[in-house]
Amino acid sequence: MRVRNRKGATELLEANPQYVVLNPLEAKAKWRDLFGNDNPIHVEVGSGKGAFVSGMAKQNPDINYIGIDIQKSVLSYALDKVLEAGVSNIKLLWVDGSDLTDYFEDGEIDRLYLNFSDPWPKKRHEKRRLTYKTFLDTFKRILPENGEIHFKTDNRGLFEYSLVSFSQYGMKLNGVWLDLHASDFEGNVMTEYEQKFSNKGQVIYRVEAEF
């Protein structure tokens, strides 16, 4: 989600260390200490303006959430939502999420969310897709045995590609939704993109895949 640079974004992030982890490399293997409890840790890669991660944190107070985004302006808007929600079970990371092993120990997180990731439709960009096998290698490391990836997209091509990628990797598909919003799935929290696409009548796809 590309947005214009927000004036004061850096200062806003730095002024809220209770939510924004300013030294993420030092947090590796210490996340439960940072949260102050042993609750499960769920991570969203590419959290955008934070509607999903803040909504999930409010909906599930006994789960710790971490939202990751590389764009500081976007993350500052996510921080706005966190502050508005008044939740304490959330942290934000202003980092490139291409190698999460820089920030998480093996098996340190319990679930990973990939919501509306860049589909990188051209074949030559296949390795950039977050459901490509090298990313799955990384995700498998930081998740526990039988750890799960929950994936949503509006892009049919990326959805089909990801189903194949998960299956070829040996993952178990615990749930596949071909039209999430027309299903009986309960507890869905929408991202900004999801709300936008849904308002246009676009189908939303969802997968729960287990290592």
From Swiss-Prot:
<feature type="binding site">
    <location>
        <position position="154"/>
    </location>
    <ligand>
        <name>substrate</name>
    </ligand>
</feature>
<feature type="binding site">
    <location>
        <position position="122"/>
    </location>
    <ligand>
        <name>substrate</name>
    </ligand>
</feature>
<protein>
    <recommendedName>
        <fullName>tRNA (guanine-N(7)-)-methyltransferase</fullName>
        <ecNumber>2.1.1.33</ecNumber>
    </recommendedName>
</protein>
<feature type="region of interest" description="Interaction with RNA">
    <location>
        <begin position="124"/>
        <end position="129"/>
    </location>
</feature>
<dbReference type="InterPro" id="IPR055361">
    <property type="entry name" value="tRNA_methyltr_TrmB_bact"/>
</dbReference>
<dbReference type="Pfam" id="PF02390">
    <property type="entry name" value="Methyltransf_4"/>
</dbReference>
<feature type="binding site">
    <location>
        <position position="118"/>
    </location>
    <ligand>
        <name>S-adenosyl-L-methionine</name>
    </ligand>
</feature>
<comment type="similarity">
    <text>Belongs to the class I-like SAM-binding methyltransferase superfamily. TrmB family.</text>
</comment>
<feature type="binding site">
    <location>
        <begin position="191"/>
        <end position="194"/>
    </location>
    <ligand>
        <name>substrate</name>
    </ligand>
</feature>
<dbReference type="GO" id="GO:0008176">
    <property type="term" value="F:tRNA (guanine(46)-N7)-methyltransferase activity"/>
</dbReference>
<feature type="active site">
    <location>
        <position position="118"/>
    </location>
</feature>
<keyword id="KW-0808">Transferase</keyword>
<keyword id="KW-0819">tRNA processing</keyword>
<feature type="binding site">
    <location>
        <position position="44"/>
    </location>
    <ligand>
        <name>S-adenosyl-L-methionine</name>
    </ligand>
</feature>
<dbReference type="GO" id="GO:0043527">
    <property type="term" value="C:tRNA methyltransferase complex"/>
</dbReference>
<feature type="binding site">
    <location>
        <position position="69"/>
    </location>
    <ligand>
        <name>S-adenosyl-L-methionine</name>
    </ligand>
</feature>
<keyword id="KW-0949">S-adenosyl-L-methionine</keyword>
<keyword id="KW-0489">Methyltransferase</keyword>
<comment type="pathway">
    <text>tRNA modification; N(7)-methylguanine-tRNA biosynthesis.</text>
</comment>
<feature type="binding site">
    <location>
        <position position="96"/>
    </location>
    <ligand>
        <name>S-adenosyl-L-methionine</name>
    </ligand>
</feature>
<dbReference type="InterPro" id="IPR029063">
    <property type="entry name" value="SAM-dependent_MTases_sf"/>
</dbReference>
<comment type="function">
    <text>Catalyzes the formation of N(7)-methylguanine at position 46 (m7G46) in tRNA.</text>
</comment>
<dbReference type="InterPro" id="IPR003358">
    <property type="entry name" value="tRNA_(Gua-N-7)_MeTrfase_Trmb"/>
</dbReference>
